[in-house]
Design a protein with these regions (language model features):
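Helix-adjacent hinge/juxtasegments
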Residues: 62-100
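Short beta-strand segments that buttress and anchor functional surface loops
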Residues: 58-63, 86-89, 111-117, 139-142
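Asp-box/WD-like beta-propeller blade repeats and closely related beta-sheet repeat scaffolds
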Residues: 108-116, 120-127
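Edge beta-strand at a domain terminus
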Residues: 141-156
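Residue-level recognition of beta-strand termini and adjacent short loop/turns
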Residues: 51-52, 132-134
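Short glycine/serine/proline-enriched coil/turn segments at secondary-structure junctions
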Residues: 35-36, 64-67, 93, 118-120, ...
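N-terminal helix-cap/turn-to-beta initiation motif at the start of protein domains
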Residues: 8-23
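Short, solvent-exposed loop/hinge segments that bridge or flank secondary-structure elements
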Residues: 25-56
Length: 156
């Protein structure tokens, strides 16, 4: 194990990802238009450290308009590349594709940006935070081609 990785496990982004591990029951809100919640549901999530703490595997199950939604994300901090990276698949948004997202800043909040759709492509930003009461908040934002960012999904 490299010294850089050991340090990250003790006090860096890998440490933060380790803190997120657990089984959770939460609440998900979905916005289909700015400022208007289009659906709310209960969800169940499992976040677990895998491969010696190198990655965080996120599995979730919920519903949208009373239809089952399930998904998987892998969150990582790539020390050699100096990037935060995420691979995300689900039964609602991604169809049969994987959304890859990244951020070249590994020293702050876990926040990554990916893109989807045909030209002009839209952005999809995912942020993971832990509040002072140790609640995990995963928020996803749609970013229109012009750069306007709107909350799309939030799970607490």
């Amino acid at each position: 194990m490299s010294q850089k990785f050991e340090t990250s496990l003790c006090e860096g982004m890998h440490h933060f990802l380790q803190l997120l591990g657990g089984n959770y029951k939460g609440h998900t809100s979905v916005w289909f238009e700015p400022g208007v919640i289009g659906d709310e549901t209960l969800c169940e999530e499992t976040l677990r450290s895998v491969l010696g703490g190198r990655f965080l595997l996120h599995e979730y199950v919920g519903s949208l308009k009373e239809k089952l939604v399930e998904g998987i994300s892998i969150f990582e901090c790539s020390l050699p590349d100096g990037k935060l990276q995420t691979a995300w698949i689900d039964s609602f948004h991604s169809g049969s594709t994987t959304m890859f997202s990244e951020n070249p800043d590994i020293n702050h909040t876990y926040s990554v940006l990916g893109h989807y759709g045909l030209e002009p492509r839209c952005g999809w930003k995912t942020q993971i935070k832990m509040d002072q009461s140790k609640r995990i908040i995963i928020t996803m934002f749609n970013i229109a081609p012009g750069g306007v960012e709107e909350k799309a999904v939030e799970t607490v």
